[in-house]
């Protein structure tokens, strides 16, 4: 079984009747994702792309079993939606929503931890197991099945880099966005711990960006635990000026912390091959894996 989701994963879409929810429900279904129900309060009894809609997660689960949730609920109501998913035992809960207040995010993460629930995001493009299932907004055609895991703070860079790996004949085991907000569920270290034991993954690509300390923490983990699989990385935002937010709420340099230079240095010290430009990653990945060198 892949690390988070696989072809057997049964999914509920929270916020299925909204523009994004309904659009991406159709694309996820077309990719092969097993969406068993949608939830939008007040819209119970309707259907979206043939999928039954319920007023609550609890009523959706009374009608049939589900494993995981993907959340397209607007930021103001996302906390409530996440709590409902956690209460119902859905795991993982993949939160696509951007702009969730930090205080709400802290409450969600604390509650998830108490309940042993894995949260992906918020402000994530989601998670995909290529050729099997995708939960989120990733364009399926960028990905192909294989043995390289891609873990990213950026959505669009995930697609670009995965597409370049695919183009070079290097498939992926799992690709996921940890989310661009300052407070997220899974971080790089959590995912590396999963990938360490994952028989489907031979090597890892980390896509980081300025701000915060997620990449430095990953570098420390890789170094101190002698992470057994090769890791390549790219850090976005080398040219970013201090104090300016670059796209994501979490992508901001404060003082000397969180600069691209620091992150690149820490990763390099940990034995990670850091790409100068995203298009270098297929080559670096190929050089690290004997089976790909032919």
Which residue stretches match the model-derived regions?
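Catalytic-core regions of core metabolic enzymes
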Residues: 1-294
């Amino acid at each position: 079984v892949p690390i988070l989701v696989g072809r057997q994963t049964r999914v509920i879409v929270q916020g299925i009747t909204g523009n994004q929810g309904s659009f991406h429900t159709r694309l996820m279904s077309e990719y092969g994702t097993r969406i068993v129900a949608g939830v939008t309060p007040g819209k119970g009894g309707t259907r979206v792309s043939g999928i039954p809609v319920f007023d609550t997660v609890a009523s959706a689960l009374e009608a049939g079993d589900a494993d995981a949730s993907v959340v397209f609920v607007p930021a103001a109501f996302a906390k409530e939606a996440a709590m409902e998913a956690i209460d119902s035992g859905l795991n993982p809960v993949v939160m696509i929503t951007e702009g969730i207040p930090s205080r709400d995010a802290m409450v969600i993460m604390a509650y998830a931890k108490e309940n042993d629930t894995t949260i992906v995001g918020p402000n994530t493009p989601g998670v995909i197991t290529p050729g099997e299932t995708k939960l989120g907004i990733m364009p399926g055609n960028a990905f192909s099945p294989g043995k390289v895991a891609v873990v990213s703070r950026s959505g669009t860079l995930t697609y670009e880099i995965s597409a370049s790996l695919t183009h070079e004949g290097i498939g992926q085991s799992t690709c996921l966005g940890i989310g661009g907000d300052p407070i997220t569920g899974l971080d790089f270290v959590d995912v590396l711990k999963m990938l360490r034991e994952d028989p489907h993954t031979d090597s890892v690509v980390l896509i980081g960006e300025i701000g915060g300390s997620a990449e430095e923490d990953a570098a420390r983990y890789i170094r101190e635990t002698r992470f057994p699989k090769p890791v390549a990385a790219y850090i976005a935002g080398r040219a970013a000026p201090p104090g300016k937010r670059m796209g994501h709420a979490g992508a901001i340099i404060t003082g000397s912390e969180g600069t691209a230079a620091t992150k690149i240095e820490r990763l390099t010290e940990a034995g990670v091959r850091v790409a100068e430009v995203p298009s270098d990653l297929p080559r670096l990945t190929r050089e690290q894996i004997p089976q790909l060198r032919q």
